[in-house]
A protein has these predicted regions:
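Short beta-strand segments
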Residues: 33, 90, 229-231
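Conserved helix/coil segment N-terminal to the catalytic DExD/H
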Residues: 37-45
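Active-site beta-alpha connecting loops in nucleotide-dependent enzymes
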Residues: 185-187, 209-243
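Conserved phosphate/oxyanion-binding catalytic-loop motifs
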Residues: 203
Length: 243
């Protein structure tokens, strides 16, 4: 069944009702996004996660949080024993490094750049429109697979996903075969084809960092001209528009 949600993270009672319905229908696992608004407003009170993960933090939602420090601390509140048993943190991000210093629950680190991380991207080469990736763990385990989702942010997400499900108990021999089957979600570099003679892509990127990453990804696989059309939603954080 598909249930529509008006928010990234539902209200506390709705969240528990959805989780209960999933259990009744035989679901064994729940993967969800927890927004900074939801943490700040107590929407995840009563929830306890096996693993929580931190990818990065860039300017967004300052109309609500007012400062990047407030925004960071709202996110950091999720990484506490009240809500989680363990954490996975991307230490390539400066706020990830900051979070690593203050969390009190067990932590697994991931990185595309730092080979001392618990999970490290040892290789990512583009061939025939696909990444050939090799991921290594500090314990000596490794996997090599094709990965179809281009862009550094997708490599970050892949590292996080591998670390999350491994921390939750899934072995690498079960994880590896699924990587080549992964597909992009709607609205993330989604191809639109109505018979035009050029490639048209739609992406949800709405922060300076996200827009920069998307353009860099498109440049890496494009030989011709790139035209970007950006929109700015009204009554939101106006300070990032000039960025």
């Amino acid at each position: 069944d598909k249930l529509e949600s008006a928010r990234t993270t539902p209200e506390a009672d709705d969240l528990q009702a959805i989780a209960a319905a999933m259990v009744e229908q035989g679901c064994k696992n729940l993967v969800m996004e927890v927004s900074s608004h939801a943490i700040d407003q107590g929407r995840i009170k009563g929830a306890k996660y096996e693993v929580v993960a931190f990818s990065n933090l860039t300017q967004d939602h300052l109309d609500y949080h007012l400062s990047m420090e407030n925004y960071f601390q709202a996110k950091a509140n999720l990484f506490a024993s009240e809500y989680a048993k363990a954490a996975v943190i991307n230490i390539d991000d400066s706020y990830g490094k900051k979070l690593l210093k203050q969390v009190k629950i067990p932590v697994v680190t991931v990185s595309r750049k730092d080979s001392t991380a618990d999970w490290y991207l040892a290789k990512a080469e583009i061939k025939n429109g696909l990444y050939q990736v090799e991921i290594k763990s500090k314990s000596g385990e490794s996997l090599s697979e094709n990965f179809a989702l281009l862009g550094d942010y997708n490599l970050d997400n892949l590292l996080l996903a591998v670390a999350i499900v491994n921390s939750a108990g899934l072995s690498l021999d079960k994880i590896a075969p699924t990587i080549s089957k992964l597909q992009s979600v709607p609205g993330r570099l989604e191809s639109i084809n109505v018979g035009q003679k050029f490639t048209a892509l739609v992406d949800y990127a709405h922060t300076p960092d996200a827009v920069e990453r998307v353009i860099a990804t498109v440049k890496s696989v494009t030989s011709g001209k790139i035209i970007g059309v950006l929109g700015c939603g009204g009554d939101r954080d106006a300070s990032k528009r000039s960025l």
